[in-house]
Every structure is written in C-alpha cells, then in structure tokens.
C-alpha cells in the first residue's frame, strides 16, 4: 500500500510539471482560419480594420473586422476586397 501511495505521489508531481505544447509561446498562433468567403461586398462605413489569415490555414483570406467587432472572411483575389476594402482602410 505504501509503495502505491508513493508511486501515485511521484506521478502526480511529475504531471504537475508537464505542460501541454499549446501552452508554449511558440505554439500560440491564435489567428483564425476561414472556411468560406463573404459573397457580397461590405459597406465601407462598417469596416474598422483588416488582417490576413495565417499561411497555415487551408484557404487564404482577408478578415475584415467591423465596427461591431465581427470578423468577416473575404477572398483576397476579389477586386472589391483589394481595391475598396483594403485600400480604403489603408487611406484612413
């Protein structure tokens, strides 16, 4: 009985010092990925900022953040995304 209690204490101590890989600062990529694009242009007055998704994502995308803090995925190949969305935010 004493051996199993000691073994349990050692395992518990070892588990306390183990950290998951996701807790590492090198693995903390929190950039969202997109799985569908917006089908129509957004009004420019609704846009506050934008960012690109990570290269680790399966679909490249521009994520527009609206004034209400909603994140909307858009196709970076679309003309309205480049010319109206991104350019208008860069001008401000």
UniProtKB/Swiss-Prot annotation:
Biological role stated in the UniProt entry: Chemoattractant for blood monocytes, memory T-helper cells and eosinophils. Causes the release of histamine from basophils and activates eosinophils. May activate several chemokine receptors including CCR1, CCR3, CCR4 and CCR5. May also be an agonist of the G protein-coupled receptor GPR75. Together with GPR75, may play a role in neuron survival through activation of a downstream signaling pathway involving the PI3, Akt and MAP kinases. By activating GPR75 may also play a role in insulin secretion by islet cells.
Q: Where in the cell is it found?
A: Secreted
Residue pairs linked by disulfide bridges in the UniProt entry: 33-57, 34-73
Which terms in the Gene Ontology molecular function aspect does this entry carry?
CCR chemokine receptor binding; chemokine activity
Please provide the Gene Ontology terms (biological process) for this protein.
Answer: antimicrobial humoral immune response mediated by antimicrobial peptide; chemokine-mediated signaling pathway; eosinophil chemotaxis; G protein-coupled receptor signaling pathway; inflammatory response; positive regulation of cell migration; regulation of insulin secretion
The entry's keywords: Chemotaxis, Cytokine, Disulfide bond, Inflammatory response, Secreted, Signal
- Species of provenance: Felis catus (Cat)
Give one Pfam family, short name only. IL8
PROSITE patterns per the record?
Answer: SMALL_CYTOKINES_CC (PS00472)
Q: What is its main location?
A: secreted
Q: Which gene encodes it?
A: CCL5
Question: Per the record, GO CC terms?
Answer: extracellular space
Task: Name it.
Answer: C-C motif chemokine 5
Signal sequence coordinates: 1-23
